[in-house]
Amino acid sequence: MSSPAQPEVPAPLANLKIQYTKIFINNEWHDSVSGKKFPVINPATEEVICHVEEGDKADIDKAVKAARQAFQIGSPWRTMDASERGRLLYKLADLMERDRLLLATLEATNGGKVFASSYLFDLGGCIKALKYCAGWADKVHGQTIPSDGDIFTYTRREPIGVCGQIIPWNFPLLMFIWKIGPALGCGNTVIVKPAEQTPLTALYMASLIKEAGFPPGVVNIVPGYGPTAGAAISSHMDIDKVAFTGSTQVGKLIKEAAGKSNLKRVTLELGGKSPCIVFADADLDTAVEFAHYGVFYHQGQCCVAASRLFVEESIYDEFVRRSVERAKKYVLGNPLNSGINQGPQIDKEQHDKILDLIESGKKEGAKLECGGGRWGNKGYFVQPTVFSNVTDDMRIAKEEIFGPVQQIMKFKSLDDVIKRANNTSYGLAAGVFTKDLDKAITVSSALQAGVVWVNCYMMLSAQCPFGGFKMSGNGRELGEHGIYEYTELKTVAIKISQKNS
């Protein structure tokens, strides 16, 4: 998320203490039913930060009962004024601002995110998104409809009910807010399962949710693993909607489970292999910088990463040269330290997967311009890597890498690059760089992607809908459309004695 004026970045909080490691149900802290816990790892040091209660189906069942009770007709939550729901969300945003330093430090420590980025963009984006949803709370309404006959007809936008929300590890706090903000603003109750790698900011948020004054059972947070806690949410017969951000592979399983259970509503924000097209008439400095930012931001762990870079033939060599020069300027290290540009990957599994894909690029004939291996001997660090002479059939050009790896491909014509850009099962995002307005509009209209950035990249804001085409997901988050994803539309028709226009 971007802002014209950013606050000064303080030093990270020293001597961070982990306060919350239990399951949060009914505004109270609980041990897991099984008694199990799981370790949370600092990816920069490979050391255990703490152990967290491991929720599974039994804990999800408890959370669903609490959420269903809170959603009962006549409950404090159901009878609360919509404007009061908005006030609670505004209050939560204020508490996040108060504890911004702690949350940013926790996010950087647990998720390997560069602290300055966490403080400015993650926390800044969270607070803006929460306030946006708060403002919508008393503006979600129906319409009156001039139906035929002596009938008075109107529509109602009603909350769906109990919503299961499964959060990824790459933007744990931001995705937490993207999920709960619209759900609560519309009057739903929620069960949140944070990623097992990054549960700590979600659990801290539970304490702020209670402090803000949300009634018991409205928000419940159950840390645990996908195949147990996540699967229990997807297949639960008393959950009305599931929202998931993560891989396409898991998204398919969630949609299948939703269909086999109670046909719950589903919102999915899944993987991507997003094309970024640079035409010869583009501002080269701008294009190089945004293309770099688009794939290297947060160690490449972004679903919208500009991971298929198409550069017009006449500027290809110069673009590659500048891109390599830019990548070599990166400083790797502990994300809490000042002057660091790149932190670690989230865990060993992701780290090893990235290195495997880098090796495939070397073997399949791409030219390794820089990087290409592990960095350091502690932590899950990968060198910033740039490949040139990449062809469309290589694994690095087809598979989602989710790491700091830029692959630069060459194109000759507009028609050719559009076909190549769309030749993927994904359709989350795309970028176009050109000074030609006609070309920009033509290409952005032709690209099969949920969001297209022109002469910029990864510029997100709470007011704009976000989501994917094809196998990059279903539904939208953020914006007016993202709000309505958490409502059911009801038509009410009333017989009257006489209708008058």
UniProtKB/Swiss-Prot annotation:
Cellular component, GO annotation: axon; cytosol; synapse
Active site residues of this protein: E269, C303
InterPro entries referenced in this protein's UniProt entry, alphabetically: Ald_DH/histidinol_DH, Ald_DH_C, Ald_DH_CS_CYS, Ald_DH_CS_GLU, Ald_DH_N, Aldehyde_DH_dom
Site-annotated residues for Transition state stabilizer: N170
Pathway(s) it belongs to: Cofactor metabolism; retinol metabolism
PTM field: The N-terminus is blocked most probably by acetylation.
Enzyme class per UniProt: oxidoreductase
Reactions this protein catalyses: an aldehyde + NAD(+) + H2O = a carboxylate + NADH + 2 H(+); all-trans-retinal + NAD(+) + H2O = all-trans-retinoate + NADH + 2 H(+); 9-cis-retinal + NAD(+) + H2O = 9-cis-retinoate + NADH + 2 H(+); 11-cis-retinal + NAD(+) + H2O = 11-cis-retinoate + NADH + 2 H(+)
Record PTM N-acetylserine, positions in chain: S2
Entry's EC annotation: 1.2.1.19, 1.2.1.28, 1.2.1.3, 1.2.1.36
GO molecular function: 3-deoxyglucosone dehydrogenase activity; acetaldehyde dehydrogenase (NAD+) activity; aldehyde dehydrogenase (NAD+) activity; aminobutyraldehyde dehydrogenase (NAD+) activity; benzaldehyde dehydrogenase (NAD+) activity; retinal dehydrogenase activity
Residues annotated with N6-acetyllysine modification: K91, K128, K252, K353, K367, K410, K419, K435, K495
Region (Mediates interaction with PRMT3): 336-501
Family: Belongs to the aldehyde dehydrogenase family.
Protein name per its UniProtKB record: Aldehyde dehydrogenase 1A1
Organism, scientific name: Mesocricetus auratus
High-level lineage: Eukaryota, Metazoa, Chordata, Craniata, Vertebrata
This protein's encoding gene: ALDH1A1
